Amino acid sequence: MNAKVRLQLSAMMFLQFFVWGAWYVTAPNYLGTIGFTAGDIGWTYAVGPIAAIISPFFVGMIADRFFAAQHVMAAMHLLGGVLMFVAAGMMKGGSSPGSINFMIFLSQLTYYPTLAMSNTLAMKNIADTERDFPSIRVLGTIGWIIAGFALSWLGWSTQINMFYLAAVTGILLGLFSLSLPHTPPTQTGKVTAG
């Protein structure tokens, strides 16, 4: 396997899960300090799976037919990073938990499709997936772990900075995605409903 492609895909996986790990585990530590109840925090975690159910119907249908995967990945992460910045700004500005959770929902609508997309990008650019994919994918797990360590080391596990870290990393991954190997759409033609 080409060393440059391996490095690109490994970095993509690392950043993909760093974005998520930067806020997902420690969010209640901060949200509780700005007035979120246990129910509000429950909704913070419920909106992600709801987004995961909804987003493939739109992003998947369009991405698989009309756009290169790396371009969709870039757009999703850039938009998701901006939405996470907005959510953090709403937290800082004292917005209601419901409106903050709605903004997190919007950011997750852009994030969840990229989980499958990152695997697609990796699989389509690896000659021997059985041999090479595990060593690339494990960098995602390492990215998640390093995000947690970074929050602890920086003292951010109870601060709004975790959301800013996720936002900045998402935007960086969006920009980095533009350098990933070209991965054209797998299908062509009109989008149909059935």
PLM region spans:
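Residue-level signature of mid-helix packing/kink "hotspots" within the transmembrane helices
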Residues: P49-F57, W144-I145, F149
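Helix-to-loop junctions at the C-terminal end of transmembrane segments
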Residues: I54-A68, L154-W156
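Helix-loop boundary and gating motifs at the non-cytosolic
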Residues: M1-A52
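Loop-to-transmembrane helix entry
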Residues: T37-V47, R131-I136, T141, I160-Y164
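Juxtamembrane intracellular "pre-TM" segments in multi-pass secondary transporters
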Residues: M1-K4, L178-G194
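Structural signature of the two symmetry-related core transmembrane helices
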Residues: H71-V86
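Symmetry-related core transmembrane helices of the 12-TM Major Facilitator Superfamily/SLC fold
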Residues: A147, M162-S179
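Hydrophobic core of transmembrane alpha-helices in multi-pass small-molecule transporters
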Residues: F14, L83, S95-M117, L121
